[in-house]
Structure formats: C-alpha cells, structure tokens
Amino acid sequence: MEFWKMNGAGNDLIVVDDRQDAIPDEKWPEIIRTVCERHMSIGADGFMVVKKPTYGGDYKMLFFNSDGSMGEMCGNGARCICRYGYENGLAGEVQKVETTAGLVTGWRVDRRLYRVRLNDPCSMRLDGKAEVDGATYTTRYPRILRCIAGLLCWVICPHRPLRPERYFHRMFQPYSVRGRGA
C-alpha cells in the first residue's frame, strides 16, 4: 500500500489513495489502528483516505482518528489533503474537497502553503440528553466531564446524523490519568 506521511501544524497524518475502492470500507479501522500506532508502526495522529467524488467535489476525503474511528473533519488535515490533491493532479490550485462534514474549499498559496475554507457550523444545541454506559445525563450547557466517556454538547449538521460518539482523545477517556508534571 502506497501512502504519504504529511504534517500540518503539528498533526502528522497518513494519506492513502483508494479511488479504485481496492480496500473494503470495513477493513479500514483495523488497518488504521495498526499503521497509526506509534513506536510499533508508522505512527500518526490521523489517517485520510482519498475516494472518488460523489457530490460535486474534485475528490472525497474520509478522515479517521488514530483509533480507527471516523471523524468528520480535521482542519490541519484539510490543508494536507489539498496539497496531496494538487501534487497528484486530482485538482487545481483551487479545489473542492468532499468531507463527511460537507464541502471544503482549498487554495494553493505557494509551493508549501495551503489555505482552506471550512464549512460553517449548522446549529448548536446546548441542552439534551446523552446516554453513556446505560446512564442518561441531561445537559444544560456545554461541558466536558472527564468521568463521563462523552462530550455533552452536540453540533447538529445535516451531513451527519446525530449519534453517540465512543472514541475520544485519551485525555477524556474515563480510565485515563493526565499528569501535570513537577
């Protein structure tokens, strides 16, 4: 499998072209967990798969977190994918990239610099209910609770149905401990 390892503002990302659909979608999470593991493989913060466009973009980008879960978007990754798209002839200096969060526009500023226009947030609901591990929590304002494996604030977007998220940064996992140092 050919890949590019890219870096955008401190995030290191792996990019793979799968416009030919050579790898079944259900295989990606296992592949991603394996290749993103630091010290044991290539290691990366995230993984992007380039696919054929489906709704008017130059190409489609699927973003995955290093644990294999699909994410909607990564701004630093969007700039990387624009450079990849330009350098591989998928798009010109101005390009439209399809993401699960919507269409993103990217511009080539110079040889190494790319700018992106991320899509606007649709709406935010500051109250609601979240079910985590069988317990229901009511939210009144956005908060991140380290003892709860969830973010109690949802951004509603027409491109993605509301669903409980199960994978979070290790700092917010209920079983993690984050030291502050001496």
Give the role of each language-model region.
Residues D120-L145:
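Active-site glycine-rich loop that binds ribose-phosphate moieties when present
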Residues M1-D110, I148-A182:
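A glycine-rich beta-to-alpha transition motif near the start of alpha/beta enzyme domains, typified by
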Residues N65, T99, L118, V132-G134:
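Short acidic, glycine-rich loop/turn motifs
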Residues V104-P121, R125:
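A structural-propensity feature for long, helix-poor, extended segments
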Residues R115-R117, T138-R140, A149-C153:
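Active-site-proximal beta-strand elements of phosphoester/diester hydrolases
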